[in-house]
Amino acid sequence: FRELTRKLMGRLDAAEWMSMYERLTHWLVELSRSEDTGMKEVVDMQYQDADRQFAKFVRDEYGEWMAGPGEEVPMMSHRLLPERLPVSLAEAEGRPTFLVVIDNLRMDQWQVIEPMLAEEFRVVRKAPYVAMLPTATAYARNALFAGMTPAEIARVHPDCWVGEEEEGSKNAHENKLFSRLLDRLGVEGKHGYHKVTNLAAGRSLLENFHQTKDARVTAIVYNFVDMLSHARTEMEVIKELAEDDAAYRSLTLSWFEHSPLREMFSEMARFGARVIVTTDHGTIRVDKPVQVRGERNTNSNLRYKVGRNLGYDAGDVFEVREPERFGLPRPNISSAYIFAQEKDFLVYPNNQNHFVQYFRDTFQHGGISMEEMLVPWVELDAK
């Protein structure tokens, strides 16, 4: 712990932040199983300190990261598949490859799920990456499947981009973006894409899972963890069950144990497959309201806002006045983006008390934190 504290006092690069976060989550997971409350408090304080410093690090470096690859530029959402998928497919040597994207899967949640897969799979590679801002599905997951920034998608594939102010699902075209990416990468052979948003869809895919065996690469987007975390705002039951991060991890574990996804992994192992497990962004439990003002049609996300005439204290948020520099579309000529940091959430002055009471201690995503941005990429081979 002293070593972690000492490291936090120095200047870390992106790779060192990844390693720091993995070690902190490892200790949190381990200590949540022990009775040592004193040590838990020490790690919790380190964690808060780390998230504060990580937010500063992102504010300082993010523009450089989006400018393009370089020695100290970490892997990010829009470069992930173009750079890593061809390598993984080559290593699979003709075996089926599955890309499993579990929405909202944080590093700590992966750490509790991983042991359940150890009997059937061995880990070939662990290489966490940085989820791009906003750490929200409409941006980060489209960027992942397109292998492009949101600004590039809006320009090159306008039929696949639904802007903030437009009606309709923002992620209805992932399949199309993925197909076009595979064409661009010269990936030959049959490919598949499946999105599971509820239990019935999961069971249906499991029943027909044998059909995926003939594809060279199959993407599976599994939304259930996302439903778990979003449900915290809608269902008091979840609020009771997941009162803190440790309870949230244990809820994730029991969900996974009984989900069709667990059985799909067993099927993949039977196929002798290469399996990639990743996500488009994580999530964080919020507790501190930060007041902002916006026009009536400003987006509803609690961790980022995009719009004209946003009112806020610049010291409270990370502001982006040149969206193009950050790979983001600009809905209007005067549009800016602002991002919440650490455990903050953005609230409007009207009805503020009710709003704060309702959303405090819920899991949200879209902003800047280790939990949202430093996310798993794990490659597994069937034993």
What residue spans do the PLM features occupy?
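Feature captures the catalytic ectodomains and active-site-proximal regions of enzymes
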Residues: 1-383
